[in-house]
Every structure is written in structure tokens, then in C-alpha cells.
Amino acid sequence: MAFFRDIKEDINVILEQDPAARTGLEILLCYPGIWALIWHKPAHWLYRHNMKMLARIISQLTRWFTGIEIHPGAVIGRRCFIDHGMAVVIGETAEVGDDVTIYQGVTLGGTGKDTGKRHPTIGNRVVISSGAKVLGPFKVGNDVKIGAGAVVLKEIPDGCTVVGIPGTIVRRHGKPARELNQVDMPDPIAVELECLRRRV
């Protein structure tokens, strides 16, 4: 049965990726991310079969028990790993690919009150670090790394590393996106002097 196969795969991914995980039993008892994903499966099924209220109730109970909010309309791929999942939010029209790792405080959200597709589509083998926000109806490619605290507001091609606010591509396929030298770097003394000048 696919449900149990998926759970076994999710447990194996955690055992492979998290050095703190010792056994499958420990994961089932102590990892809220696995429970959020387990309960998302029936909630998503109910949502797709037009039993939206029951799906939302399951989703809210799961949020209350785990601190992870996955809308039952969201599509989650296989072997997703939500590590330290507190305050993860995944919106209704979000799509998450296979082998994605999501850390605490991540939001896959919208940017307003638009209807229709309003949340991101995340590719395969993506790592979304702590506190990152991916906001809007665009695609994040395969093999992308999103740095902690980044705010991503536009499409990201395959193989990129994104950091900062707003999210800026700093690496493409393991190589710097552009070479920086001293001329490109801000002068910290000049920056501080400008701040002082503005105060006066």
C-alpha cells in the first residue's frame, strides 16, 4: 500500500539525513515533521474528494499537535523531510517536489488575497533553510538551496543557491553567480559615515 511505503521512505530519509535520529521508533515518537506528513496524506485525500471541512479539521488538529501547518490542498512529494518543523507553513496551492528538506520557520505562502494559484511550486531535491520565506506563484527549480532567513519573491532556476532579502542568487551549479572583488564590496566606514550624516 502506497501510504505505508511513503511513511517508510520518510523514516528512512530522516535516518539518512539527521545524525541525531537513532531508530525508526524514535522518529515515529519524537519527530513532529513525520506526523505532520502522515496526517497530511488523509487530509489531502479528503480535500481532493470534496470533503474540505473534514480535511481542514484534520489539518488544524495536526497543526495544534505539531506546530506545523500544511493546508490540505497542498501537494507534497515523496521523501519530504520537515526537520525541527515548528512554525512551518505550507499554503493551499503550494506544490513540493520529491526529496525536499524544509527546516523550522519556513513559509511557502502567497503575497496577498489573490485567488487561484498563489503559492510556490518547489522542485525536487530542494533545501529550504530555517526562517526562509518563499512567497508567490512561481517555480523554484530542482537542486536549489535557499539560505536561512531568505525571502524569495521570484522564480529560481535549477541548481542555484539563494540568500538574503530579497533572495539573490549567489551560486549556480556550485559556482559563484558572479565574481566579487574588493571594488564590489561596500566600504563599512563609508556606510557608517553616511548613516551619521543622515542623522545630523
Place the predicted regions along the sequence by residue:
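Terminal amphipathic alpha-helical/low-complexity segments used for targeting or macromolecular assembly
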Residues: 1-62, 66, 177-200
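Structural signal for interior beta-strand "rungs" in well-ordered beta-sheet cores
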Residues: 63-170
